[in-house]
Every structure is written in C-alpha cells, then in structure tokens.
A protein has these predicted regions:
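Membrane-embedded multi-pass helical conduit in multi-pass membrane proteins
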Residues: 6, 26, 30, 39-41, ...
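N-terminal signal-anchor transmembrane helix
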Residues: 24-75
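Cell-envelope/extracellular polymer assembly enzymes that use nucleotide-activated donors
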Residues: 45-48, 77, 217, 232
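Acidic donor-binding segment of Leloir-type glycosyltransferases
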Residues: 65-109
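Long helical/loop segments within the catalytic core of UDP-sugar-dependent glycosyltransferases
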Residues: 101-109, 113-119, 123, 129, ...
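Catalytic core of nucleotide-sugar-dependent glycosyltransferases
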Residues: 183-188, 264-285, 345-350, 380-386
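Catalytic donor-sugar/metal-binding loop of nucleotide-sugar-dependent glycosyltransferases
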Residues: 234-252
Length: 406
C-alpha cells in the first residue's frame, strides 16, 4: 500500500469524524432552539440534594447559600456529606444546618475505597426522598434548576432522571479557565443536546443531575471503584432501557481549575475513569447492547481513534510545512488540514452563540484552542494509557484525586 493511499484512508477517517461532529453541532443548535419549558406537575415528589464535600471550606459558603435559594414546590432536603474534612468545612456546614431546617450536615464515616461514589452511596442510605439530585461542593445552581430537572423527569416513566447544564463561574479568570469554559459549552451542545436530539442519549455530568431513587436501587447505586462515576452510572442506566433527558435551561455554575497543574490532575482522573468505563463496557455483555453500543463506539473513537488521528494530523502539518510531505490530490492536503481547524473553531463559535457568550475574544480563543488546549489531550491520553497498563500489571487500585479549589 502506497503512502498516498494510507494518507487518503487516514484523512477520510478523520473527516468522517469531523463530519459527525458537524452533524452533532447542527442537531445541538436545533435542540436548543426547540426546547420548551417542561410541563409543571400537579404534585411534586420529594427531592434529596446530595453534596459530597472534602475540604471545601473555600467555596462552601457560596454553595450552601445557593442551595438555600432553590425554589421547589415539593419537599426538598439538602445533605452536605462531609467526607472527613480537615479544614473549616464542618464549621460552615454546621452554620447552615443550625439555621435552615432543610439543610443537614452529615459526617460520612471513614471507609474504602475513597472517593465521590462511596460518599454518594452513603448519602442515599441515610436519606429517603423519591428523587436524588447531585451537586458538587463548588456549585451554585440557579433557583429553578432542580424544579426543571424534576419536571423533565416526570414527563415519562422511561426517564431515569435528567441532566442540566454546567457553566464556568470563573471563566474570565485567565486563558485556561476561558478555554475550559468554551470546552464545556461545546461538550454540552454536541454530546448532550446534539446526541439527545439524534439518538435520545444523554450522559450524567457528575453535577446538576437527577436520578430516581428507584432506578438507583435497581442498578445497585454508584460503582465505588469508578473514578468517572457519572459516566459509569449513565452506562448502566442506559443498559436497563432508561433514558437521561438533557435540560439546557437547568443551569448551575461551578469553579474550574485555574492552573495547568490542577487541570492535568483533574483531567487525568477523568480520563482514568473513562478508560475504566470503556473496559467495563467492552467486557460486560449485560452493558454491551442497545444504545450503549453507540456509547462504546463513541468512547473508543474519542479516546483511541480521534487521539491517534489528531497526532497524525500534527505530524502531517509539520511535514507539510517543512516540505517533506508534498502529496497533492485535487486540493493540497495542507489546505484540508487548515479546514479542519476552521471547522473546530466553528463548533466553538456555535456553542458560544447558543450560550449567548459570543465575542471576538471567545472566537479568537476558539482558534487558539486547536493549537494549544486540544494538543494537551494527546499528552494526557498517552500518559493515562501507560498508567493503566502499569497499574493493571501491578494490580494497583486507582486512587481518587480531589480537585483543589481556588
């Protein structure tokens, strides 16, 4: 097989994935435009909000203040699940618990494995509401966020719950937080709204999410060994025939990493957790059917094929600039490479428009992200491949790594 043929095959595969994401972008925009407020309910079921917290003193005042302002017509109880904090998390949690009748400060017993999933399972065991809502300890949801999730859940018995939108509260802090905020907008437009419109597929994002208690009981709660417990939970829920509708109007704001080191730690944990979920999906025949087949293909595409093609495109670009690779078809291959960059940037522009965050600065950062932020993912994925390989050989249990706050 000639070099030209190989390049054509690789370029075609890359462009097929780009085309798929273009379709998701259009579908996401249509979903956002079509989305109407959920129907109000005659009777609102009881809701328990679970907030896992470990050393969250720096952000907890804002979080619990936002929880105190949530407007919900039914019974609402908030459980601050204090996971052995050593800072002033306990003082802040107790301050609110002493003053508000529906906020509870729960001290979670020490246990193993450490992490969010174990704390959430404990929270489910000490609460009794019909619906369980999860927020991270740095979140500030809009007052109507929970109500919107509940109303969407109640529209259909197949709805396991619902998932809302996450926005970056510190997006203007620096270049990194701006790029993270833009990344979140694109993810929620394509992978949430776009996939929901086309395939009726939604994925929990770990916060601003609702799940029926009955569904949790049916699937056995959260997998306490999963570092990406939200994705893993979504896969098991989908395997049971449930769906997770996406509610763009239910909005929460959260803090994102402000330094590269913290970002790498956070995303390494996410990648590790998602690779664990891929392994579980591939190995478990009970999960490997129905709409989860699409989830498997998509996750394999993102974490294996797309990363390989992104690396290939970088090599292709450099060789083209240096004049080492000069293969021309109808259009020079370097021109096609530039077109992929503009399509990438166009998706970010579409996401900012849908979130009413369009600006010259965001468009400029959208272009720069391809050459900077996106390339960091190559390093992260390769790093985590080696991590998974060495820890599998040594039979080492993965360890939860909490994201520091600012």
């Amino acid at each position: 097989m000639s070099l030209s043929t190989i390049i054509v095959i690789v370029a075609s595969a890359f462009w097929l994935m780009i085309l798929y994401h273009v379709v998701l972008t259009i579908a996401g925009l249509i979903h956002r435009a079509q989305t109407s407020p959920p129907e109000t309910s005659a009777q609102y079921p009881s809701v328990d909000i679970l907030i896992p917290a470990h050393n969250e003193g720096g952000v907890l005042f804002h979080t619990l203040d936002a929880m105190s302002k949530i407007q919900y017509p039914g019974k609402l109880e908030v459980y601050l699940l204090n996971d052995n904090s050593t800072d002033n998390t306990s003082d802040i949690a107790q301050y609110y618990a002493d003053r508000l009748a529906n906020i509870y400060h729960i001290k979670v017993p020490a246990g193993s494995p450490k992490g969010k999933a174990r704390v959430l399972n404990y929270g489910v065991s000490i609460s009794a509401g019909d619906l369980v809502v999860v927020y991270d300890a740095d979140n500030q949801p809009n007052p109507d966020a929970v109500k919107l999730l509940v109303e969407k859940t109640l529209e259909n018995d197949r709805n396991a719950g619902a998932v809302g939108t996450v926005r970056t509260i510190n997006m203007q802090k620096n270049s990194l937080t701006r790029m993270i905020g833009l990344e979140f907008m694109v993810f929620q437009l394509l992978m949430q709204s776009g996939r929901w419109l086309l395939f009726r597929l939604g994925t929990y994002t770990g916060t601003n999410m609702l799940v029926r208690r009955s569904v949790l009981a049916e699937i056995g709660g959260w997998d306490e060994h999963a570092l990406a417990e939200d994705t893993e939970l979504s896969m098991r829920i989908v395997s049971r025939g449930f769906v997770i509708p996406v509610v763009p109007s239910s909005i929460t704001y959260e803090q994102e990493p402000e330094t590269l080191g913290v970002w790498i730690r956070q995303r390494s944990r996410w990648l590790r957790g998602n690779l664990y979920t891929i392994s579980k999906l591939v190995k478990d025949p009970d999960l490997r059917h129905g709409q989860n087949l699409l989830n498997i293909v998509q996750m394999l595409t993102i974490y294996y094929a797309f990363m390989a093609l992104l690396l290939f495109s970088d090599v292709w670009f450099v060789l083209g600039l240096l004049g080492i690779l000069q293969i021309h078809f109808t259009i020079p291959l370097l021109i096609l490479w530039f077109e992929t960059v503009w399509i990438y940037a166009a998706q970010i522009v579409a996401a900012t428009v849908s979130e009413r965050q369009a600006s010259f600065t965001n468009i400029l950062f959208g272009v720069l992200m391809y050459f900077t932020y996106s390339q960091l993912w190559i390093y992260l994925v390769i790093k985590e491949y080696f991590f998974q390989l060495t820890h599998h050989v040594q039979n080492v249990e993965p360890v939860w790594d909490k994201t520091p706050r600012f």
